[in-house]
């Protein structure tokens, strides 16, 4: 069984990941909150032997091609231990925080994932 723990702020990411690994945690995750979900993972990749994942990275405010490049590079830096988790978030959050339309979220997410896989 794999145990995962939340990573937290980017400035403490490497130290926290190393401490968690020493405690038997096999992977760390981030989410779209007060910090960018990718920066802590980039800091840990190649430094600590743990699985890395975004629990939820919000898709719609991002460009799928740019995120595809970021995920590809992070996967290489992590030696194949990165998992990208995406989410759509809720309408008020997307429209107010990011100023992005939230029309047809299921169809948009499908198109988004197809573009990401391309």
Explain the meaning of each model-derived region.
Residues 2-6, 64-118:
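Flexible, glycine-rich active-site loops centered on histidine and acidic residues
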Residues 1-55, 61:
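N-terminal beta1-alpha1-beta2 module of alpha/beta enzyme domains
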């Amino acid at each position: 069984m794999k145990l995962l723990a939340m990573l937290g702020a980017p400035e403490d990411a490497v130290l926290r990941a190393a401490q968690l690994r020493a405690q038997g945690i096999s992977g760390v995750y981030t989410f779209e909150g007060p910090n960018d979900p990718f920066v802590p993972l980039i800091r840990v990749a190649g430094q600590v032997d743990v699985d890395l994942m975004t629990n939820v990275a919000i898709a719609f405010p991002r460009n799928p091609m740019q995120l595809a490049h970021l995920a590809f590079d992070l996967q290489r830096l992590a030696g194949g231990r990165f998992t990208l988790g995406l989410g759509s978030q809720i309408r008020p959050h997307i429209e107010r925080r990011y100023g992005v339309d939230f029309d047809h979220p299921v169809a948009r997410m499908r198109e988004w994932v197809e573009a990401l896989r391309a």
